[in-house]
Amino acid sequence: MNIKKIAIPVVLSVVALGLGFWVAGKLFDPGTGSRDQQVTPEGLQGYMLSPARKIAVPTLVKGNGSSFTGNDVKGHWTAMFFGYTNCPDICPTTMAVLVQAKKQAATQGVEFPEVVFVSVDPERDKVEMLGEYVGYFDKDFTGVTGDSKLIDALARQMSVVYMRVPSVTDDPDNYQVDHSAGILLLNPEGKLTAFLTAPHTPTGIVDSIQAIINHTPPA
């Protein structure tokens, strides 16, 4: 697969066509139907949930062919991003920013989460293709795909929005997927803890992660 190198802009000024995680002040837990309480520690570009939201992670498939389960988001912080390999701009740019953020975090001594890229286009994002795509950015990043109903269920739990945009050509497979542009942070218990909002920058991500960790009581 040939993936063009992505130049990282100083500021990533893209939002997925208005699709976000929530309408300000109205983020609901789909499991309970109750409104989430939000806090914004200094330095965080986004919101934290108080308390963190329990997530039932379904069994999906990693880019290397092995199973991805709830155990894969426990014991460490996780940064989860929903996208797809045919995404023309938001996905490759966000992944490239995450690569730079990881490097910056290492120089600053900041714990960086494990990155998980969840495909919102499982019909086209086959396992091997997804593994190659994600591995292009960082071999330690994890690509995840699987049954569309299971991905839908995971996305709903995490307040992620996405929808297929029909092709404007004669090729029905030449479609795009509009999707949320934010990054989700799960704590070492596997609970949804925070939303990092676009536009993303390496410094913004690192500062946000540090703010979240500092604001989270030790287990």
Language model segments and positions:
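Thiol/disulfide oxidoreductase modules built on the thioredoxin-like
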Residues: L150-S208
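Short loop/turn microsegments at loop-to-beta-strand junctions
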Residues: I55-A56, T78, S180-A181
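Periplasmic c-type cytochrome electron-transfer domains
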Residues: G33-Q38, T142-D152, H179-I183
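N-terminal targeting signals for export/organelle localization
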Residues: M1-A56
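Short, ordered coil/turn segments that flank beta-strands lining enzyme active or ligand-binding pockets
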Residues: G63-N64, P188
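Structural microenvironment flanking redox-active thiols in thiol-disulfide oxidoreductases
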Residues: T93-L154
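Short active-site neighborhood of thiol/selenol oxidoreductases, capturing the structured segment around
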Residues: F68-T94, L98
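Hydrophobic beta-strand positions
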Residues: T59-L60, L185
